[in-house]
């Protein structure tokens, strides 16, 4: 069996024994993070929002009104924690050995997907990009600018 697994969800499984909100953050540069939140209870995760790219301010807003304990994981966790984590009640940084994605997290996320019947063939696997790459954004801007020049 084969299934596509969210890197953010795989990271969240590193903190599944935590009781509260697992905030996953991968540094997306330009003061943004790839972000997802999960409720961790009794060794299971419940997704609270889809994977998305958000500004650091949006990340702060997503957590500051939540009363449950919060733990940050991912390579953007330190950035988020340094930017706003110390100002949010009940927010902590996961220990380094639990902060990054591991094969075990991918396996746990895949097990959940397989139990829900979300398997596919290897040929059907495709990446799920949350935003265009810098080269794609610059190309789109050049095309838009050249189109505006032609149209007057």
Q: What is each PLM-predicted segment?
A:
Residues 94-152:
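Acyltransferase
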Residues 1-101, 129, 134:
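Surface "functional belts" at beta-alpha junctions
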């Amino acid at each position: 069996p084969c299934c596509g697994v969210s890197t953010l969800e795989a990271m969240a499984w590193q903190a599944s024994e935590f009781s509260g909100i697992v905030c996953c953050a991968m540094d997306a540069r330009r003061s943004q993070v790839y972000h997802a939140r999960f409720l961790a209870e009794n060794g299971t995760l419940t997704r609270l929002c889809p994977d998305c790219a958000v500004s650091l301010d949006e990340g702060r807003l997503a957590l500051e009104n939540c009363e449950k304990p919060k733990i940050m994981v991912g390579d953007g966790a330190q950035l988020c924690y340094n930017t706003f984590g110390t100002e949010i009640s009940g927010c902590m940084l996961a220990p380094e050995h639990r902060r990054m994605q591991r094969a075990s997290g991918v396996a746990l996320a895949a097990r959940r997907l397989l139990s829900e019947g979300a398997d596919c063939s290897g040929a059907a696997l495709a990446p799920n990009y949350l935003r265009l790459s810098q080269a794609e954004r610059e190309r789109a801007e050049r095309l838009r600018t050249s189109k505006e020049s032609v149209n007057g």
